[in-house]
Design a protein with these regions (language model features):
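Nucleic-acid 5′ end/cap handling module spanning
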Residues: 1-130, 134-143
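Acidic, low-complexity intrinsically disordered tails
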Residues: 148-153
Length: 153
């Protein structure tokens, strides 16, 4: 295991995105029908960080064509779309709910999601500092207003 870990770290240092490891003592199995072998494991780093939610949109292709995508922003002001880790039907339902005007005259999105901090998992950063393959479980953290935090002290 230590040898595999050392090779993995070497691959990452050389710019590779990870390593493929075959299960010990397993025979080599060719990919069938374009799927990976069950004895071949992909080892890649996963990072997570919190980003501010600034908008939302729907997907444009395939089965995610009407499913929600969350738009976040990096500290440097770069915007990127994040895929929620939800079933497509649930993403569609959330997309339908976002523009609904609530009793206070604001949208559901503005009341619940805008300016919240959301935890995003990603595979690394692009050369522009944008998360690659970003996804989220829709876990948010709402910051206390500065005035309320100061009053509590």
């Amino acid at each position: 295991v230590a040898a595999v870990g050392a090779l993995y770290e070497t691959f990452l240092a050389e710019g590779f995105e990870g390593a493929m490891v075959r299960v010990p003592d397993a025979a080599y199995v060719y990919s069938r029908k374009g799927y990976h072998s069950s004895v071949l494991l992909k080892v890649k780093p996963t990072y997570d960080a919190e980003f501010r939610v600034i908008d939302w949109e729907t997907g444009t292709r395939g089965k995610a064509a009407s499913a929600i995508m969350i738009i976040c922003e990096t500290a440097a002001g770069k915007r990127f779309a994040v895929t929620p880790a939800m079933e497509i039907a649930d993403r569609n339902a959330l997309a339908a709910k976002m523009p609904i005007i609530e009793d206070n005259g604001k949208t559901y999105f503005d009341n619940v999601w805008r300016d919240t901090m959301i935890t995003v998992q990603y595979a690394g950063l692009s050369v522009d500092g944008v998360p690659l393959q970003p996804r989220t479980r829709m876990q948010t953290r709402v910051d206390e207003p500065v005035a309320a935090a100061a009053a509590a002290d």
